[in-house]
């Protein structure tokens, strides 16, 4: 886990100023934070919350960030968290973002920190699970905030930590996610020059950071198709329209 964090820190150092170097003791700092990082991840994995319902998750994050002595804004975008670290050297304003919501999935693994949480989703009682790695994302960004705060004098510019709710999509007609964070002006004060998201990937070697300019990871959206049929007598099917047959061909 600490290798993932190291990758993020190295990436941040390169992004803010390729002339900057991480402090010589960052390796020791990583080792010290690793047990806490693992503990956080297991806590969030065991206590997942659905989109726009991340009340306990957001509070847990905000309460910890406040102990670091940095500016914390909570709640934002319903259940999200924003924190600001002003570095000791001049530089850009860069945001690091992690998503915090879980999915309506039943966890079926024999782990001591497996989720047993249930919630209502779509009018049904469902299991809730961090099946997309957001528990890791939260923990990595919290640890990054801790380490960058510890080396605040060496940080060039300002770092904005964004813990985004409802990344998987706000339920129903609710607002949420990145759009709501932007709408509330979280990228305007301070004026963020670049935002870097974070996502783990089982196909990427541990300790490796992949990045590129512009958009990188795909997005998904929802749409509904309504197929209208036409009834007819069973002996005269040609007089009707079978919506099942038509739907199967879409």
What are these regions (language model features)?
Residues 20-129, 139-156:
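Acidic/His- and Gly-rich active-site-bordering loop/insert found
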Residues 1-22:
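Bacterial Sec-dependent N-terminal signal peptides
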Residues 8, 15, 29, 49-50, ...:
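A generic structural signal for short
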Residues 118-129, 135-136, 148, 153-249:
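Histidine/acidic-residue-rich, glycine-tolerant segments that coordinate divalent metal ions
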């Amino acid at each position: 886990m600490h290798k993932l964090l190291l990758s993020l820190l190295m990436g941040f150092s390169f992004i803010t100023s390729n002339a900057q170097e991480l402090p010589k003791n960052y390796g020791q700092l990583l080792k010290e934070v690793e047990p806490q990082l693992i503990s956080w991840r297991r806590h969030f994995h065991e206590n997942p919350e659905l989109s726009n319902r991340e009340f306990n998750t957001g509070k847990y994050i905000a309460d910890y960030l406040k102990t670091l002595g940095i500016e914390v804004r909570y709640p934002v975008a319903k259940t999200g968290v924003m924190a600001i670290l002003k570095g000791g050297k001049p530089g850009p304003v860069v945001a690091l973002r992690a998503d915090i919501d879980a999915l309506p999935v039943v966890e079926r693994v024999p782990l001591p920190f497996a989720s047993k949480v249930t919630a209502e989703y779509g009018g049904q009682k469902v299991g809730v699970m961090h099946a997309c790695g957001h528990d890791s994302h939260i923990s990595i960004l919290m640890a990054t905030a801790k380490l960058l705060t510890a080396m605040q004098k060496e940080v060039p510019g300002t770092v904005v930590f964004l813990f985004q709710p409802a990344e998987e999509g706000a339920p129903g007609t609710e607002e949420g996610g990145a759009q709501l964070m932007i709408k509330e002006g979280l990228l305007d004060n301070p004026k963020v020059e670049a935002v870097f998201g974070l996502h783990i990937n089982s196909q990427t070697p541990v300790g490796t950071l992949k990045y590129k300019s512009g958009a990188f990871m795909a997005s998904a959206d929802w749409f509904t198709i309504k197929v209208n049929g036409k009834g007819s007598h069973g002996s005269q099917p040609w007089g009707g329209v079978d919506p099942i047959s038509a739907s199967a061909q879409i």
